[in-house]
Amino acid sequence: MSQVLGKPQPQDEDDAEEEEEEDELVGLADYGDGPDSSDADPDSGTEEGVLDFSDPFSTEVKPRILLMGLRRSGKSSIQKVVFHKMSPNETLFLESTNKICREDVSNSSFVNFQIWDFPGQIDFFDPTFDYEMIFRGTGALIFVIDSQDDYMEALARLHLTVTRAYKVNTDINFEVFIHKVDGLSDDHKIETQRDIHQRANDDLADAGLEKIHLSFYLTSIYDHSIFEAFSKVVQKLIPQLPTLENLLNIFISNSGIEKAFLFDVVSKIYIATDSTPVDMQTYELCCDMIDVVIDISCIYGLKEDGAGTPYDKESTAIIKLNNTTVLYLKEVTKFLALVCFVREESFERKGLIDYNFHCFRKAIHEVFEVRMKVVKSRKVQNRLQKKKRATPNGTPRVLL
């Protein structure tokens, strides 16, 4: 396997003006024998504030993800491996969580949400515990079950948690991670998932709650299954997901690409992919490619004094596999990357792919520019509402 990393050369001004005038994707039938188009981005003059997704959002518009489960089920290990790049072997030394740990996943990545890690022994249904406040602002509830332990108690706790949460907020996505499956055989994995699925849904049916939908995932921190499961959880919280999938479908159909992922490079969560099925091996190759690009860029991409960033708007990578497949990575935004699977014969039309990528990249920026405007508008409305509450009838409230 050969690896090529590099940054494209700046584009001539005349070429940039021509691309500025044409913003439609070019189909394979329209491809000519002219020179390859450059990788340079004509939109480099766009305001950085629009593209910088590290701006922390208010809690009113940021989804909340709850991590729940019994003690030693692996909740904290999942959080550390996915969002803190901790080695799975190091999680063996993590202490049990004895209080609710809240973390913002927003200042280092495009993916914006809060994670609340609940200790297994806490009774959050205690009368002194405001569980309604917690569930009211929740987008997804992840319940972690240790597949290598007796899970009858976990299923009882799952049923209690889901029924209480559903009464408060019917819009919560309920996700069940059947965790630590790395120690099980393939047959045992399937049997365990079937048994947990059957028992959990039977309990809901007996309680007359057939409307509640539970999603089940087989996960382990020792492979990429936990990243794929978290990707699917986060995707449900992204309102722009149908638009992103549609853009990816248009891009690959016009560029001769077999598969494309839109990755968050910090967490290796893919926030969108095209409509073709996701193969686990394909996803693992994408994750490995991102690691290679970031690691090599950290070594060779920084200045002698350590200044600069290992990943920027000119970042690109090409990895040719020994099965005539090419992996192609391109920067989309500050924390987003597009990873494509292309056949070698299709990659000969690199100019077409790069031009269509420019159109795709511009569309992504426009989608999230609208998103930023909506968020800012909500912030302004919240401030106005607070001011109205603070000054009833035009008289400032005096705090005693």
Curated annotation (Swiss-Prot):
Residues 11-25, 36-50 have a biased composition (Acidic residues). Residues 1-54 are annotated as: Disordered. Changing S76L: In HOMG7; increased positive regulation of TORC1 signaling; increased phosphorylation of the downstream molecule S6K1; increased RPTOR-binding. Its main location: cytoplasm. Changing I221K: In HOMG7; increased positive regulation of TORC1 signaling; increased phosphorylation of the downstream molecule S6K1. One of its GO terms (cellular component) is intracellular membrane-bounded organelle. One of its GO terms (biological process) is positive regulation of TOR signaling. It catalyses: GTP + H2O = GDP + phosphate + H(+). The keyword ATP-binding does not apply. Belongs to the GTR/RAG GTP-binding protein family. It is linked to Hypomagnesemia 7, renal, with or without dilated cardiomyopathy: An autosomal dominant renal disease characterized by hypomagnesemia, hypokalemia, salt wasting, and nephrocalcinosis. A subset of patients develop severe dilated cardiomyopathy. This is Ras-related GTP-binding protein D. The lineage of its organism: Eukaryota, Metazoa, Chordata, Craniata, Vertebrata.
